[in-house]
């Protein structure tokens, strides 16, 4: 990979577009990388969510929680523009 991006939870790339492709180019595509990719080991005594909150967040450990914000939608994560 020629242009490595620094640590950031949101990465982007530009898909290949052939001059013979009948569709218009997409432009940049965005994707998120989870926080656990950047942890070399799991430290002891990590802070935890309560069991009910962990079910809602999708993880037990607060350091591994990553809020998802849709980069293709304007406004906040719930679709409200403001």
UniProtKB/Swiss-Prot annotation:
Stored InterPro entries: Spore_coat_CotJA
Function in brief: The cotJ operon proteins affect spore coat composition. They are either required for the normal formation of the inner layers of the coat or are themselves structural components of the coat.
Name of protein: Protein CotJA
Lineage of origin: Bacteria, Bacillati, Bacillota, Bacilli, Bacillales
């Amino acid at each position: 990979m020629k242009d490595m991006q620094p640590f950031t939870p949101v990465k982007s790339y530009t898909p290949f577009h052939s001059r013979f492709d009948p569709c218009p180019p997409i432009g940049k595509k965005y994707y998120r990388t989870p926080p656990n990719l950047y942890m070399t080991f799991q430290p002891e005594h990590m802070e935890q969510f309560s069991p009910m909150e962990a079910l809602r967040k999708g993880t037990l450990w607060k350091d591994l929680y990553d809020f998802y914000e849709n980069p293709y939608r304007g406004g906040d994560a719930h679709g409200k523009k403001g």
